[in-house]
């Protein structure tokens, strides 16, 4: 039996499946699976999902909103709802919070989680977050992530994790965050299963993982997925060629560009290891030295030490410090700048002037490798400081970027490969309804349900 209930007045709901929830249901029975979309049903970023099986409830991610977000639930309100007012609408105590990866829109509210609730992440994510927040000055995050904090617990992708009435299997998946994870949940009471996709894509160096995961679930573990919770970031974004570049394409384009332009700044997230690898190896192919500040150098060393153990793909050339750039004033060099988000205009100007004068001809080019929405004044996420910096280069800007999320074709293939049996619930998207128009079998289109933030989906 399936029932849906919501925190809002059900009489005003338009969807038939949601109106049916007006029938009273006992959502405290041990044989009931509950999924609560606290935030993410109608927005990108700030994702928080709750899964309850038996007497055990966990959150997946606890993220802050993205810059310029116009979501209906603010960070402060969501914290109060989940943690302060919790017992007003559920008897289930939270047994833990699991994090899919280290991006701020998935971990940004981690320091607001009550201290009696355990936190789970894989060891790579923990190492990266510790390195990141050593440089941010966020004391609360630094203390939470310290090695002496026993509430931080690590898991290993592919190995069973048991929390109360749940068995959980994490799966490594390709994303613009290194070592992102999907989670397969199984009730130890009813054997109901839920696959939470987290963020994923099919264009990175580890893209084969997207094909492997469904096979592992069905063949190695012998499981079928009842409910698929899947991201849909790209459902409202263009799918033209610039969004469909693979990391192999990024490396190829960068290699060709560097052949003709030997002094280049690169704007790319300092935690996007795949793309940083692409640019560093493109520079190596052209025998151009690579420079970065101490933060970039440390992050690349952390990434390379972890990933380099498994494949030579992530072996990087030596990265020189900015001081060496200043002293040498080279004729050629690739300078990794990070993302440059959230800077004031004057900071952007001074950074350009300082770094460009370290180059001999003072006419460097720029590779911009991030989402273009940050540069558009019409977009809520517009970053004036970043846009100011980019404008200084005029026509000497080259856009080379591989999207961090799955496009519609990849989403459709993933859904059919997973082959869920009951529901498909879109998350991390502004176009959940678009899932019904994906090129998937009709039976899967009929499984798509469109809850609002705060709705609870339950079945026995």
Language model region names:
Residues 3-96, 105-274, 278, 285:
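His/Asp/Glu-rich metal-coordinating catalytic cores
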Residues 50-55, 59, 181-420, 444:
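Metal-dependent phosphodiesterase/nuclease catalytic metal-binding core
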Residues 66-67, 126-129, 203, 297-300, ...:
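Short gly/pro/ser/thr-enriched loop/turn and capping motifs at secondary-structure boundaries
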Residues 101:
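Conserved G/P- and acidic residue-centered "switch" motifs that form tight phosphate/ATP-binding loops
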Residues 105, 155-161, 176, 272, ...:
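Short acidic loop-to-helix transition motifs that present clustered carboxylates
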Residues 118-121, 141-145, 287-292, 443-453:
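Short hydrophobic/aromatic-enriched beta-strand-loop microsegments
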Residues 411-437:
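C-terminal structured "cap/appendage" subdomains that terminate the fold
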Residues 428-460:
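Active-site microenvironment of metallo-dependent hydrolases
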């Amino acid at each position: 039996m399936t029932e849906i209930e919501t925190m809002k007045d059900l009489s005003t709901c338009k969807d038939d499946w949601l109106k049916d929830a007006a029938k009273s249901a006992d959502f405290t029975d041990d044989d009931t699976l509950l999924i609560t979309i606290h935030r993410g049903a109608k927005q990108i970023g700030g994702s928080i999902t709750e899964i309850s099986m038996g007497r055990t409830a966990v959150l997946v991610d606890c993220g802050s909103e993205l810059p310029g977000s116009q979501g209906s639930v603010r960070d402060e309100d969501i914290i109060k709802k989940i943690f302060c007012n919790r017992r007003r609408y559920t008897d289930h105590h939270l047994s833990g919070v699991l994090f899919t990866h280290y991006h701020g829109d998935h971990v940004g509210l981690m320091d607001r989680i009550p201290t009696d609730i355990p936190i789970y992440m894989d060891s790579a994510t923990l190492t990266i977050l510790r390195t990141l927040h050593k440089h941010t000055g966020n004391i609360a995050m630094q203390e939470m992530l310290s090695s002496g904090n026993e509430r931080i617990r690590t898991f290993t992708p592919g190995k069973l994790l048991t929390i109360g009435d749940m068995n959980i299997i994490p799966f490594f998946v390709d994303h613009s965050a290194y070592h992102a994870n999907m989670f397969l949940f199984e009730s130890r009471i009813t054997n109901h299963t839920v696959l939470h996709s987290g963020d994923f894509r099919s264009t990175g160096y580890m893209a084969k993982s997207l094909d492997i995961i469904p096979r592992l679930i069905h063949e190695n573990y012998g499981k079928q997925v009842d409910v698929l919770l899947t991201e849909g970031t790209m459902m409202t974004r263009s799918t033209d060629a610039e969004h469909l570049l693979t990391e192999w394409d990024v490396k190829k384009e960068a290699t060709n560009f560097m052949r003709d332009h030997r002094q280049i700044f690169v704007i790319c997230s300092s935690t996007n290891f795949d793309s940083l690898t692409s640019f560093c190896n493109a520079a190596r192919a052209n025998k151009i030295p690579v420079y970065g500040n101490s933060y970039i150098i440390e992050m690349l060393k952390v990434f390379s030490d972890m990933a380099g153990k498994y494949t030579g793909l992530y072996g990087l050339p030596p990265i020189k410090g900015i001081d060496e750039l200043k002293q040498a004033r080279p004729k050629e060099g690739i300078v990794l700048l990070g993302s440059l988000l959230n800077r004031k205009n004057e900071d952007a100007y001074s950074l350009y002037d300082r770094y460009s004068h370290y180059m001999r001809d003072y006419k460097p080019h720029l590779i911009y490798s991030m989402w273009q929405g940050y540069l558009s004044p019409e977009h809520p996420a517009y970053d004036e400081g970043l846009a100011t910096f980019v404008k200084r280069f005029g026509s000497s800007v080259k856009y080379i970027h591989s999207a961090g999320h799955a496009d519609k074709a990849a989403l459709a293939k993933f859904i059919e490969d997973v082959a869920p049996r009951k529901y498909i619930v879109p998350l991390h998207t502004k176009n959940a309804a678009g899932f019904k128009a994906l090129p998937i079998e009709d039976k899967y289109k009929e499984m798509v349900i469109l809850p609002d933030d705060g709705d609870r989906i339950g079945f026995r």
